[in-house]
């Protein structure tokens, strides 16, 4: 059985398998140390997001609890916001991950949107974003994607984050960062935390949702954390007690297996280095496929500009394809994506990138005399 496993497992899943087996041998110990394990996990999450040398970490100025991945972390914060800031709203970027709207709506927190993406340039609509932040009521709540914005893959640069932080400070806004892709934007987990650390350096109180579904491949383990930065350790203790009350009524207790996997990796120098190396390998492949897709489209002499493919970062390529073009790809080429044109770059490989590029070229060519007759492709795959 072991030899069969060695033949079929990928390097990442094989290492995770052996680590899981190692931890499984200690399952009886876990049962007696769940509270300690989860407390350590929260510490590890906060250090990863805020930095080992952050004053927030040194002074224990944070409240945090394990959550059921990123969705659970956002849901906990939304409930916290509803209970203690009942008249507040959450400003969401337009567009954002569709589940954000459902999470805050189900928590009975009103949502509004702020400008973010420019369909014309397929880039950041920065000045409109800044204006919306300035025009929002003082002390508003804003959800921010610190890296690898979902679905657009468009992130502010360092100077833009500094300006955003400055305006937040003037307006006394509260930033809530949903960090589902730390490491997936640049291949460097430290670099991808830059936005959050800019806000911390500027003295903001803030909230953060973290998920290890993508960067550690622990999707089915539902491993996440929500943390809130406070003025002092006493306030942090009070906030934590309220978060724990919400957890108790919502799902009582989170699993311990996933958090222990994360803590084991983050506290072992060799394992952490291996993890960071594998994240970079994964991101390098995504970048490589972006370059290949762009080059292939440009070689087809497309009249469209495709530079946004390589300017965007993260798992997704926000293509800018219209709903009609998306439907055309599905109907005639059996290429599937979300209706807003978001393509998962993880599904693009060297064996299918030419086909994908040709199909995109076909549906975006206005006067293409070689358009495929859809009647010839009426079959189910």
Give residue spans per PLM region.
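Conserved PLP-binding catalytic core of the aspartate aminotransferase-like
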Residues: 274-332
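Conserved core segment of the aminotransferase class I/II
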Residues: 201-279
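Walker B catalytic acidic pair
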Residues: 179
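Hydrophobic beta-strand scaffold residues
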Residues: 111, 175, 206, 336-337
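Hydrophobic alpha-helical scaffolding
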Residues: 119, 154, 189, 214, ...
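Conserved core of the PLP fold type I
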Residues: 22-172, 182-184, 189-201, 321-322, ...
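N-terminal "arm"/small-domain region of PLP-dependent enzymes with the aminotransferase-like
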Residues: 1-34, 40, 44-47, 249, ...
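Short Gly/Ser/Thr- and Asp/Glu-enriched loop/turn motifs at secondary-structure junctions
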Residues: 60-61, 308-314, 338-342
């Amino acid at each position: 059985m072991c030899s069969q496993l060695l033949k079929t497992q990928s390097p990442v899943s094989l290492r995770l398998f052996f680590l899981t087996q190692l931890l499984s041998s200690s399952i009886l110990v876990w049962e007696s140390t769940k509270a300690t394990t989860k407390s350590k996990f929260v510490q590890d999450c906060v250090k990863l997001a805020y930095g080992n040398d952050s004053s927030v970490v040194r002074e224990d100025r944070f409240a945090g609890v394990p959550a059921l991945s990123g969705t659970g972390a956002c849901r906990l914060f939304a409930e916290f916001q509803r209970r203690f800031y009942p008249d507040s709203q959450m400003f969401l970027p337009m567009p954002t991950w569709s589940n954000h709207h459902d999470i805050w709506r189900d928590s009975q927190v009103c949502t509004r949107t702020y400008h973010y993406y420019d369909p014309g340039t397929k880039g950041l609509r920065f000045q409109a974003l800044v204006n919306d932040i300035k025009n929002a009521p003082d002390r508003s709540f804003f959800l921010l994607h610190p890296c690898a914005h979902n679905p657009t893959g468009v992130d502010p640069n360092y100077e833009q984050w500094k300006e955003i932080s400055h305006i937040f400070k003037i307006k006394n806004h509260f930033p809530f960062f949903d960090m589902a892709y730390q490491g997936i934007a640049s291949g460097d987990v430290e670099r991808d935390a830059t936005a959050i650390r800019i806000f911390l350096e500027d003295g903001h109180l803030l909230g953060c949702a973290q998920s290890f579904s993508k960067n550690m491949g622990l999707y089915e383990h539902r491993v996440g954390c929500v943390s809130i930065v406070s003025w002092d350790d006493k306030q942090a203790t009070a906030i934590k007690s309220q978060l724990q009350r919400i957890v108790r009524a919502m799902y009582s207790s989170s699993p311990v297996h996933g958090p222990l996997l994360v803590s084991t990796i983050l506290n072992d120098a060799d394992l952490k280095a291996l993890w960071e190396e594998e994240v970079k390998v994964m991101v390098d492949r995504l970048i490589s496929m972006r370059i290949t897709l762009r080059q292939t489209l440009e070689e087809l002499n497309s009249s469209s500009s495709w530079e946004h493919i390589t300017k965007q970062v993260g798992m997704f390529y926000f293509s800018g394809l219209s709903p009609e073009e998306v439907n055309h790809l599905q109907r005639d080429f059996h290429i599937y994506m979300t209706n807003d044109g978001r393509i998962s770059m993880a599904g693009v490989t060297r064996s299918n990138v030419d086909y994908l590029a040709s199909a995109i070229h076909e549906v975006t060519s206005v006067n293409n005399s070689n358009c495929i007759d859809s009647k010839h492709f009426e079959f189910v795959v």
